[in-house]
Amino acid sequence: MKITLPPFDQARVLVAGDLMLDRYWHGGTDRISPEAPVPVVHVRDIEQRPGGAGNVALNVAALGGQPELVGITGQDEAANELASLLENAGVACHFRRQPGAATITKLRVISRHQQLIRLDFEDGFPGAHARDLLPQYRPLLAGCGAVVLSDYAKGALRDPRPLIEAAREAGVPVLADPKGRDFSIYRGATLITPNLAEFEAVVGRCADEDTLVRRGEALARECGIEALLVTRGEDGMSLVRPGEAPVHLAARAREVFDVTGAGDTVIATLATGLATGLALPQAMALANLAAGIVVGKLGTATVSVAELRRALQEQEQSGRGVLTEPELLHAVADARAHGERIVMTNGCFDLLHAGHVAYLEQARSRGDRLIVAVNDDASVRRLKGEGRPINPVQQRMAVLAGLASVDWVVPFSEDTPARVIGAVLPDVLVKGGDYQPEAIAGHDAVVAHGGRVEILDFLDGCSTSAMIERMQSAPDT
């Protein structure tokens, strides 16, 4: 199924975890201190943003969702500032304020878009345990479509199993962003989202995707977790579910500017998508797009619905048009990874007419992506005789690629497209005319792979041969 934006405004997501306040001091630097070999920064702007679980909730709100946030803070001004930032962004805050403790604060000094130093202000929350959040957490489960556990190993989620058990009792899926090397503490979770370094710290180095999948499946079974989504930086992300085919998505970032908080964006988009009823692979595809957007921003940041919509449009348009066969196979694999159904047809398409256009629109309606395989000039000549084609293959393909219904056009040189159809193995193979499905080139390969073959009607009164005859019989002017 083609990926579309779900009704995010209907998604209620409960986020629980470690809360922190991110502060940014921006300034210019053009000299070295006489006191020590360090740059002198002239601070011109001070910025504050929610971090940790707060950034996850902020990402949910930026998508239009309804986040409920539970976590531990101190009884201090930083907690007040954090609550104000979040509530102004549409996040409902349910803080457990611990007397005598300080809210975790991280200060970053930035000049010319480069982070010069980070200062952490934190003493932890001695004696804190995840079960301490249950009084705020449990009443919020009713009506939530997903739970996110955002673990930064600061104490709020020390032994998160009581929170997972409460959510599962309420029938709410649980997504956890893990920390540490013991993933068994997330037993019962629907999904955990380690990055590659965190994953390999537990299972060892994975030299290839097959190893990653094999070890991921074993880890999921061992820890009692339904699925793992391993984020792999520039290599994209991989979804591993025991007993199901893995899903690998390529990274979508055009330029990586700052990876701070990218994991928060991924899990927030996943949870918000799942809370609207999206299947996990579809939510994963949206999360992959969101990650590609957010790493192009500085610091902990969010992704808007408008940005996601634009990224979806760009993704749909990218790679469209005339492709070589290797390029086509790569595009098909990527489309399938995003849950899209592939339709394929073929023909000479020498003189494009209204019948062709109507036929291709019918074909496109059978799935999400339409491939048109086009006979090259020598192939047309063998089939139609001397004098054909009227238009060379590059022109025929260019015209087809300009149609809104057509995604990809590929040439073939054989008398039939059986070989290229067998390489693509479309979900739906279509042909126009009065053929029997079994007589269609590529039928056996498509059906054997679980696809189907469909015969479509041509538009009456439209024929390339008739057009040629009319042109030949027309009086000279």
Curated annotation (Swiss-Prot):
PROSITE patterns, per database record: PFKB_KINASES_1 (PS00583)
Active site positions: D264
Intrachain disulfide bonds: none
Protein name: Bifunctional protein HldE
Region of interest (Cytidylyltransferase), ranges: 344-477
Keyword annotations of the record: ATP-binding, Carbohydrate metabolism, Kinase, Multifunctional enzyme, Nucleotide-binding, Nucleotidyltransferase, Transferase
Protein source organism: Alkalilimnicola ehrlichii (strain ATCC BAA-1101 / DSM 17681 / MLHE-1)
GO cellular component: cytosol
Name of the encoding gene: hldE
